[in-house]
Structures are given as C-alpha cells and as structure tokens.
Regions:
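Short, structured segments at the rim of ligand-binding sites
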Residues: 1-426
Length: 426
C-alpha cells in the first residue's frame, strides 16, 4: 500500500487512539484474573489483536461488544501447543513468562521483525525459575515448559523493561511470596509504572523499592473477582497528532490523560521547549504552530518518541539534540539509521554521534518517495513531516501503521489533510 501526502494545513478536533501499552497489559491481567473482566475503550491495532489471540490460545473466552470486550478466564489453561504473538515486542516479552505458569510444553513464536530480535534473556533467566527452555540461538521460536517457580533473581533491565513486565505479571499471578525481582540498570521506568498500576487495579500487590527491587510479600487476589478496566488514550500515537498540530495546525486532540504514567507523555515537554502553541487541558490538548526553535531532549526512557521528535525537529530552527539512540537498534527497524536515511530523502540532515542524534532543522523539507521499512512509527513520522513539505510525499509500505494505529491516515484526513491511499491489486 502507498500513501500520498500533500502539503497543507490541519484544523479540527480528533480523538487519540487507545493505548496498546495499556490494552495489552489489560489483556494479560484479564487472562490471569479468575473471573470476568470488562475492558472498555479497547484498541484494535495488529498488536492488540495479537494479544487477544494469545489469551484465547491460553484459555480465555473473549466476547466483543460495542466499545467493550468481555473476557472470561480461569487462569492460564493452554488449549494449543503453540502460541503466536504476531510482531508485538511487548507481547512476546510479557506473555512468555505468563505462558510458563503452565506445566504444558508450549512453542512460542512471532512474525516479521520479531524473528530477529534477541530473546536470550529467557535462556538465561528461565532455568533459574525451574522452566525448561530452548531457543533458536537466542532468537524465536522458543520451546518452554513450566510451571514457573517464583524465586529471588537478579535481571538486567537495560535492553527492555518489557521482560520485567512479564515477570511481574507471572510472579503476581503465580503466588510469589517472600521473593524479589532485583533489577540492574532499568530503562523505561514509566512503562513499569503502568504495569504496576494495572497489577494494583486487578488486586495484586508488588512493592517497588526504587526500581531496583520488586518485592512480593504474598497475598492479594484469592477469590474470583469481576473487574472493569478502561484503556487509556495512547500517548505514543497521540504524539504524532500533537506534532502534526505543531507543524500544520492548529488542532485539538482529545482523550489524552496528562496524569498518565505512559512514558510518551514526555512529548509535551518537547513541544513546550520548542515553542509550539500548546494548551493542555483536562482530557483535551490544543496545539498549533509557534516560532519553532531547536531543543534538547533525553528519550532514553521513551525511545518510541524518536520518530515524532525527528519530524518535529525538522521544522525547528537550529540543531536539535536527542539522547538515547542506543535504545533504537532492536525496534521494528534500526530506527536511528532508518530515520537518517528516510528523512535524508526529504532533504533533512541527521547526524548520529554515539548515543546522541542531531537533527539540523528549519531548512525546509522536500516531498519525496520514502519507505516505512515496515515500521509503523517511521510511516507516521514521514506522513507528519510531509504535511508542510514542498511537494508531494509518497510513503511505500504505508500499511505498517496497522501495527499500532490503523486509523492514522483516516484521522489526518478528518483534520483536513489530503491523503490518497493506493492499495495493491490482488
């Protein structure tokens, strides 16, 4: 699929999509909750659908209603010998420890870029928890057999916090008592805040000791309970809408909670620092262009903000410096190099200097033919940058957005953007 974006202005109001970070964690909690869970404002991205597929394979019954999912579960009871997590990094890292609560042998696999991402974390940690594991030289597929036995362990938190998220769910639901998960060099702390928030909502108790140790005293959920959970608006997808507003607005974005623990809420600080016309309110954010100037930003704890930050920085006068490049290698693409290459086609110079990215902005963009590299955030970043470029921009493999924000192009159109979609003939 190709998307052709014409230069133009945006105006109007749009609702942010549902957070896949929140949605996927809610699916995990609903599986582990022995009872009925109602999930309101559910997402429908590819990653969200993959999470629902996983919990169904593990025994949950899912009924879809109008803006609500009803999930009935008795815990992890695999009905199949294989589970596929799609292309969801969070899905594979979070659900694998949960799957290991079962004593049945299970094959865990994924698709696309997930097949090349490192999974040797499980090779190292699972034997310490009584789990048999075999990987494909540190890659998928994984063959595992539990049951997981919660014990005090020490893990490396520098590659991804998602492994810790999975262990926290598995320990909590597995009845961990008097044991700790100790973590060295934890990155993306806000995502652990979100995990702890969901665990608490469903009645599980975990003591966070300064993000260096997570202690389980025992207790928590015993009897079956009916739960209700509302999925938050997505700051990750919403960041692209907000940057679009700063470049080509003014627009209003609804459905984003400024009190959220989501890491990508930090986009507000970047928008403020660069001089965008920003007015946050309760569940509503007004955003429009200002005299945009270069800014400095540390994205170590929110690496998914790199693509929208780069799109923003291209319109900011001067050299913007973004820290945290080391977090970009194991995404859907190698995002540091991909951003450099694809934005280079639009005339933007991006320098990579160790852990820092330098974007030389304010010099105008030229429409070009760019490629998503099958990465949803690259596709959205290019689309947003194209809104004020000189000439048309064509995004190849534009359907990559379906991973997290399938309504993205439609939402741009609702705000007045001219987006022409060309689908391949089958």
């Amino acid at each position: 699929m190709e998307a052709l974006i014409k230069s133009g202005r945006l105006t109007g109001t749009i609702q942010a999509p549902a957070s896949k970070s929140s949605m996927q964690r809610a699916c995990a909690a609903a599986l582990l909750n022995k009872g009925v869970t109602s999930i309101h404002n559910p997402g429908h991205s590819n990653d969200d659908q993959a999470a629902l597929g996983v919990i169904q394979a593990l025994g949950a019954e899912v009924t879809r209603g109008v803006d609500v999912l009803t999930i009935v579960s008795q815990g992890v009871r695999p009905g199949k010998a294989a589970v596929n997590c799609g292309e969801s990094g969070l899905g594979i890292r979070m659900f694998t420890p949960i799957i290991a609560l079962s004593e049945k042998p299970i094959a865990v696999n994924g698709e696309g870029s997930l097949l090349t991402r490192p999974m040797d974390f499980f090779d190292e940690i699972f034997p310490q928890l009584g789990i048999r594991v075999a990987s494909n030289k540190g890659r998928l597929p994984l063959e595992i057999q539990g049951p997981l036995q919660p014990r005090t362990i020490t893990i490396d938190g520098s590659l991804s916090s998602q492994f810790l998220t999975g262990l926290l769910f598995a320990y909590a639901a597995g009845g961990a008592k008097g044991v700790s998960i100790k973590v060295n060099n934890l990155k993306s702390r806000p995502y652990i805040d979100l995990t702890l928030q969901v665990l608490q909502h469903f009645g599980w108790k975990v003591e966070n000791r300064n993000y260096e140790e997570f202690y389980f005293s025992g207790g928590g959920v015993e009897a079956p309970a009916d739960r209700t959970y509302t999925v938050e608006g997505d700051w990750s997808g919403g960041a692209f809408l907000l940057v679009a507003g700063a470049i080509a607005g003014p627009i209003t974005v609804k459905g984003l909670d400024t009190a959220s623990t989501q890491a990508d809420k930090a986009i507000l600080q970047a928008l403020k620092d660069c001089g965008a016309a920003l007015t946050p309110g309760e569940n509503t954010i007004d955003i429009g262009p200002g005299k945009l100037k270069a800014f400095q930003f540390d994205a170590t704890d929110c690496p998914d903000l790199f693509p929208p930050l780069v799109a923003l920085a291209t319109y900011c006068e001067g050299t913007t410096v973004i820290k945290g490049v080391s977090r970009l290698a194991h995404k859907e693409s190698n995002r540091g190099l991909t951003l450099q290459d694809e934005f280079g086609k639009m005339g933007v110079v991006i320098g990579l200097d160790g852990d820092r990215m330098k974007v030389y902005g304010g010099k105008g963009l030229k429409g070009a033919v760019v490629h998503s590299r099958h990465d949803h955030r690259i596709a959205m970043a290019c689309a947003v940058a194209a809104l004020r470029a000189e000439g048309d921009t064509t995004i190849e493999e534009a359907q990559a957005i379906n991973k997290s924000y399938p309504d993205f192009y439609e939402h741009l159109q609702q705000l007045g953007a001219v987006v022409n979609i060309k689908k391949e003939l089958v």
